[in-house]
Swiss-Prot record:
The keyword Magnesium appears for this protein: yes
Function: Catalyzes the ATP-dependent 2-thiolation of cytidine in position 32 of tRNA, to form 2-thiocytidine (s(2)C32). The sulfur atoms are provided by the cysteine/cysteine desulfurase (IscS) system.
Region (Disordered): 247-284
Biological source species: Myxococcus xanthus (strain DK1622)
Protein name: tRNA-cytidine(32) 2-sulfurtransferase
Record field: compositional bias (Polar residues): 263-276
Molecular function in Gene Ontology: 4 iron, 4 sulfur cluster binding; ATP binding; metal ion binding; transferase activity; tRNA binding
Entry GO CC: cytoplasm
Family: Belongs to the TtcA family.
Amino acid sequence: MAAPMNDVQRLEKSLLGHMGRAIADHRLIEDGDRIMVGVSGGKDSYTMLHLLRELQRRAPVKFELLAVNLDQGHPGFPADKLEAYFQREGYPYKLLKEDTYSIVLEKTPPGKTQCSVCSRMRRGILYTAAVELGCTKIALGHHRDDLIHTLLLNLFFAGSIKAMPPLLRSDDGRNVVIRPLCYAPEKDIAKFAELMAFPIIPCDLCGTQENLQRKRMQRLMEELGKEIPNVRQSVLNAMANVRPSHLLDKTLNPDPLHASEEGATTTEPKDTQGSASPWLESRQ
């Protein structure tokens, strides 16, 4: 009889299930991939790196991992803490350093969040580094709640129905971004990171600004969750259950007179928590 699982093992199994299904559903990882794993020092990226290595040991295909951290010149950024962690855990790694901190502060108006400018600059640096390092994919640690909050932000403030795709090719075609945690709940990631005692590095630029629109979306979902327990999973399911003929975008529905009534009523949402994929089975 197998020994009972402890909290870490239970969370790891659940998170591996979410990650394995996301990879299988969206073909995020292929045989021979060399994956740059963006590790910021936050709970999400640490968890992603840990889970990817666990999957690497049992995956139906072979792939490489390269942990990469970008030091953007934040005052007091403890790059040595990350390097010590990578060395202790035996991860192949590369540390990048680009002083974008001063540029971000210069280009951001007073009272505004630096997140958008910071993320654009960081993305450009990572894209270039991925090509130089021979990486075929860039893995980012966005989770289920990030996708939901992004969808709501675009809906409420940008007038568009757009979230974060699990897999995205860059405009120039040189890079492919994957989000293996896209099905994983943030609360499970946070608890797992706490139990694993990852050496978390807080973000001084964006993590402490309370009046961000994203924080408002987070609070909104928390309030809705009190009345609708499964609301987060329902919103995630909606992203995989789109009916273009029932929206107003004429590019998606050029012939409305012949639009199908299929999907006009509520249907059973796609289950992102279904049976285990081959990614969750041991490799022979």
